[in-house]
Amino acid sequence: MFCVQCEQTIRTPVGNGCSYAQGMCGKTAETSDLQDLLVAVLQGLSAWALKARELDIIDHDVDNFAPRAFFSTLTNVNFDSQRIIGYAQEAITLRESLAVRCRLHDATATVDHPMAALQLAGNDIPTLLQQAADFALDSDKAIVGDDVHGLRMLNLYGLKGAAAYMEHAHVLGQYDDAIYAEYHAFMAWLGTQPSDVDTLLNNAMGIGKMNFNVMAILDRGETDAYGNPQPTAVNVRPIAGKAILISGHDLKDLRMLLEQTEGTGVNIYTHGEMLPAHGYPELKKFKHLAGNYGSGWQNQQTEFAKFPGAIVMTSNCIIDPNVGNYGDRIWTRSIVGWPGVNHLEGDDFSPVIEQAQSLAGFPYSEIEHMITVGFGRETLLSAADTVIDLVAQKKLRHVFLVGGCDGSREERSYFTDFTLNVPQDCLIMTLACGKYRFNKLDFGTLEGLPRLLDVGQCNDAYSAIILAVKLAEKLGCGVNDLPLSLVLSWFEQKAIVILLTLLSLGVKNIYTGPTAPGFLTDNLLAILNEKFGMRAITTVEQDMNTILAA
């Protein structure tokens, strides 16, 4: 096993990465190695998808499957070895079918790629694990060096994050052939084990640019289906009654669950990245969308154990449900998997609803505690002139975007302390699950504007980018000249690709934490600092003073 893709990876004086029987996330060495094998197979599939496009053949089954299967290898998504093997088998079936189509079009069609003809050595796990050893992500690290290896991981993990957003967009019916062509090109290229530093750096930025377009179609899919988010008060305390908790990012699953539970007496609660759902008109209209439950994903083993109903995981992040003894009450969807946990196929939530009705539910309603969400793209843009006027009147000094992933590391208290130390004449925008570090605090208002503006899920970084561009246009300056600073927390691969997106758009002087990615060497961090001004967080006082003095 070798895995260095998340923030909690093991770090030692001799190297970084989880390389034992089990990773820090709970992923076994078995599952990790099988995921490496799956990635290699998917790289071969993408190589054939590129060849097919040369012949004017676009296979939508391949396009739909490839990012979804890649998504299953993200942190805290799928821990089920058999499901990973199933994805690899399906990838090979799709690849061979596509190869046949290509040869029917051109009998000489072939693909010169190291993974283009990769076959599984068997169907049993021991045999596949022996084969997987050849595809370990660090297999040639000693040869190519730490910097090249780190850049490969930056590209691979960034592309994983983009694949996740592609799948979210696909679920909502969004498709852009240019994006899929780019995805396959990057995926196939990574399978060739590239080693040129400049190419690796440039392609990392290319993945970031591609992801901006992915976030755009995802934004379109969500707003077309559910309307533009509106500022909405959300109760974060439970009310009496039967209950289902839904976590992850898939708003379509939430919509179906709301429709199927209407009139059943079962209340629906959002968790984690589902919180922004309360701002969408077509979702918040359901009266039994009762509120938001819990905090950051890392606390789920305690919080889910106390939840007296059924739980649905639609995407990341799932961690071992057996620790809290709620494995019989949790259901996985789509690419999510945990061994022995019920997996819900199709769109019928009846088994979940029946289970919720058989469980105790909340015995009484707690005193309400309301927070506000729903400051999406249109709401932010409508406030642009107000923000500009406040800046001109020197009533608004600075805007901070403080967001990203949450996690268990103690150093993440920095982000709570940072927001508490933001001066009263400044605004705070936030997005993604890092907001749980401070989103239940009262930051008050500034000239009628809430000082804390919840922009949405991690992919809603798109809205923040659009706002920044609009403000810069109105003020006749560049985005980097705005009184705007980004202070981002990262944990997994979606955060990596959003960082690449920001860097690819020329956004500079981003503060990141709580630690640097374990795959980035000191040399690579120095390059990112030199080119983009990207820097690690230090102390709240020092960083705040530096930002406001700029």
Swiss-Prot record:
The UniProt GO MF terms for this protein read: 2 iron, 2 sulfur cluster binding; hydroxylamine reductase activity; metal ion binding; peroxidase activity
List required co-factors. [2Fe-2S] cluster; hybrid [4Fe-2O-2S] cluster
What Gene Ontology terms describe where this protein resides (cellular component)? cytoplasm
Domain of life, per lineage:
Bacteria
Which reaction is the catalytic activity of this chain? A + NH4(+) + H2O = hydroxylamine + AH2 + H(+)
Q: What is its EC number?
A: 1.7.99.1
Q: Where does [2Fe-2S] cluster bind?
A: C3, C6, C18, C25
Q: Where is this protein primarily located?
A: cytoplasm
Recorded hits in InterPro entries, A to Z, give:
HCP/CODH, Hydroxylam_reduct, Prismane-like_a/b-sand, Prismane-like_sf, Prismane_a-bundle
Supply the Pfam families for this chain.
Prismane (PF03063)
The record's remark on the cofactor is:
Binds 1 [2Fe-2S] cluster.
- The answer, when asked if Cytoplasm is one of the entry's keywords, is yes
Keyword terms of this UniProt record: 2Fe-2S, Cytoplasm, Iron, Iron-sulfur, Metal-binding, Oxidoreductase
Residues annotated as binding hybrid [4Fe-2O-2S] cluster are H249, E273, C317, C405, C433, C458, E492, K494
What class does this enzyme belong to in the EC scheme? Answer: oxidoreductase
Q: Please give the biological process terms from Gene Ontology that the record holds.
A: response to hydrogen peroxide
Query: Where, per UniProt, does this protein localize?
Result: Cytoplasm
Residues annotated as carrying Cysteine persulfide in the record are: C405
PANTHER family recorded for this chain?
Answer: HYDROXYLAMINE REDUCTASE
User: Which function does this protein serve?
Assistant: Catalyzes the reduction of hydroxylamine to form NH(3) and H(2)O.
Member of which family? Belongs to the HCP family.
HAMAP family documented for this protein = Hydroxylam_reduct
Know the name of this protein? Hydroxylamine reductase
